[in-house]
Amino acid sequence: MCDVLTIRDLSKSFARNRVLNGVNFRMGKGAVVGLMGENGAGKSTLMKCLFGMYAKDTGQILVDGSPVDFQSPKEALENGVAMVHQELNQCLDRTVMDNLFLGRYPARFGIVDEKRMFDDSLTLFASLKMDVNPRAVMRSMSVSQRQMVEIAKAMSYNAKIIVLDEPTSSLTEREIVRLFAIIRDLSKKGVAFIYISHKMDEIFQICSEVIVLRDGVLTLSQSIGEVEMSDLITAMVGRTLDKRFPDADNTVGDDYLEIRGLSTRYAPQLRDISLSVKRGEIFGLYGLVGAGRSELLEAIFGLRTIADGEISLAGKKIRLKSSRDAMKLNFAFVPEERKLNGMFAKGSIEYNTTIANLPAYKRYGLLSKKKLQEAAEREIKAMRVKCVSPSELISALSGGNQQKVIIGKWLERDPDVLLLDEPTRGIDVGAKYEIYQLIIRMAREGKTIIVVSSEMPEILGITNRIAVMSNYRLAGIVDTKSTDQEALLRLSARYL
């Protein structure tokens, strides 16, 4: 039996930058192959070459033993190769069935046959054991449900190969279990998956094989039963990381940021939140998706209207009616949705690095190009951003490097309070370690840091204390050294 996918000596360059260099691998029917690598390693480029979004420079791609050279994603889909992107690209104001059959609506007498479309959708969902209403509007659905629709859409093309790019980045634990069940079920039917993820625990749970890219070169290709986590880390970063998390040796001082009885005005409403965070402390916020963690950070940064309660800084009551007020008090905020709220996608690295601190780069009342460039170069060096130059568009960078630029933007202001919402989501293990080191270094300098994370090992690995949110209320605050994952889960379900 021939392999469902074979890639031979595939190379791809952009200008003088070689992104893929002679990549070789193959996968059989029903295989679930994990694809790992640091941000910028070439994972996305490889998949875009497979999916017809990029033209390869050299090499060969074979599907079911036959050479293919897809010129577009449409052609790839029609030949059984589908891709579910991390950033779901859907028409949110249209129905599920509209999205399923977009561009290929069944017609009768020149008119869209909605009954057939509805019936075909029901049949498709039933075959995948999915309980989805074809007439539901996409906007009304959760991220996990929308993701299931994308997988169903792939199967409506009789997909042989489905690429999943960071599929669990916005899912709850229960939704991840459901996704894995669907992957296993389709795998038994012969559908092959390429599973792109930075979460090693998931790779070991769901994948039968794993491949690793580093700087465009394949550095590891093995059965999942033959590798250890340390092997994957070494293959990805080119060196051994003795520990998953750096030692948090920051010294915690007195209370600095205090919140008393805080409730917000508009839905979703926070209710009666009280906590205090100390100078030099790394304070974690944990909870299930939709528990109110992001909303609390937004309220602290002046992005949500406070109905009751108060916030104090160094013992003095403060008023936060806008993000401008928060910035004047030397607060910094890195949002969860970096592409939507954290950066200007059409701006350069220099623009995104300096935009939050423009008055500091003036000379004689005018912006100094020299100072702007020096600031960008300073943060590129400090944050180890992989880029061509400060003038490069931030959208051209990998997710991890984009996040480094966003954090660097705030470091230019030397903040006293740093609010980080999922700072390592979608970032490779090497970049994660660097961000952990940065967080600990800032805590050592006496900064007050609040970190939201959905990854329990991460929040237990880098924080001093953890507040657990449940249904927009504070369920409890625990000392990190004296708690565990089970205790965090119990607290997160307290008000459900």
From Swiss-Prot:
By which gene is this protein encoded?
A: mglA
Topology of the protein relative to the lipid bilayer? Peripheral membrane protein
- What's its job? Part of the ABC transporter complex MglABC involved in galactose/methyl galactoside import. Responsible for energy coupling to the transport system.
- Alphabetic keyword roster: ATP-binding, Cell inner membrane, Cell membrane, Membrane, Nucleotide-binding, Repeat, Sugar transport, Translocase, Transport
Q: Which organism was this protein described from?
A: Treponema pallidum (strain Nichols)
Query: Localized where?
Result: Cell inner membrane
The UniProt entry, under Pfam families, shows: ABC_tran
Q: Can the keyword Plastid be found in this entry's annotation? A: no
Give me the residues that bind ATP, please. G37, E38, N39, G40, A41, G42, K43, S44
**Enzyme class, UniProt record, top EC level:** translocase
What do we know about how this protein assembles, alone or with others?
A: The complex is composed of one ATP-binding protein (MglA), two transmembrane proteins (MglC) and a solute-binding protein (MglB).
PANTHER family, per database record: CARBOHYDRATE TRANSPORT ATP-BINDING PROTEIN MG119-RELATED (PTHR43790), GALACTOSE_METHYL GALACTOSIDE IMPORT ATP-BINDING PROTEIN MGLA (PTHR43790:SF7)
What reaction gets catalysed by this protein? D-galactose(out) + ATP + H2O = D-galactose(in) + ADP + phosphate + H(+); methyl beta-D-galactoside(out) + ATP + H2O = methyl beta-D-galactoside(in) + ADP + phosphate + H(+)
What are its GO cellular component terms?
plasma membrane
User: Would the keyword Nucleotide-binding turn up in this protein's UniProt record?
Assistant: yes
- Extract the coiled-coil ranges from the record: none
Q: What is its EC number?
A: 7.5.2.11
Q: Which GO terms describe its molecular function?
A: ATP binding; ATP hydrolysis activity
Write down the superkingdom of origin: Bacteria
What this protein is called in its record is Galactose/methyl galactoside import ATP-binding protein MglA
Q: Where does the signal sequence lie?
A: none
Q: What family does the entry list? A: Belongs to the ABC transporter superfamily. Galactose/methyl galactoside importer (TC 3.A.1.2.3) family.
Which segments cross the bilayer? Answer: none
What is the protein's major site of localization? membrane
The ABC transporter domain sits at 5-240, 243-496
